[in-house]
Amino acid sequence: MYIEMIDETGQVSAQMQEQITELLQFAAEKIGKQNKEMAVTFVDNKRVHEVNLEYRGIDRPTDVVSLEYKPESEIVFDEEDLLDNPELAEMMEDFDAYIGELYISIDKAREQAEDYGHSYEREMGFLAVHGFLHINGYDHYTPEEEAEMFGLQEEILTAYGLTRE
């Protein structure tokens, strides 16, 4: 999985970015999405508030904003077209590869790590996996969805070694 890391704050270390990249690659393998691409942008509360307002109509900062990429129009090709034209098949794979982007507020991550009594690294990892699952179709609107999504994110974090301390 290719993950573009963007640090708009200048405060997220290369080591932290690498750890989150590895964690998301691990999560991608866990749910069978290894051949996908995404972006993670680290921002402050002011910027995440702007993103929330622009894309979700939410007038406040949140810890993570997940923007799932959905093409405006679906391009449909007959399977024979793809078999006859390897270049077209490759182009379609690339087209389908980008799944979305995350905006993680480092301010909220610090606040929540302190509030929950665990490390900043654990909180950043939690937010990354939580957002990643959202852009892959997981949600927590119903108790059943919540149990599935939260169970999976805890399973991923624990298997990776990011437990609550």
Swiss-Prot record:
It holds the Pfam family YbeY. Its main location: cytoplasm. InterPro entries: MetalPrtase_cat_dom_sf_prd, YbeY, YbeY_CS. Disulfide bonds: none annotated. It is an enzyme of class 3 (hydrolase). GO terms for molecular function: metalloendopeptidase activity; RNA endonuclease activity; zinc ion binding. Its cofactor is Zn(2+). Zn(2+) binds at residues 130, 134, 140. Binds 1 zinc ion. The keyword Hydrolase applies. It is found in: Cytoplasm. Belongs to the endoribonuclease YbeY family. This is Endoribonuclease YbeY.
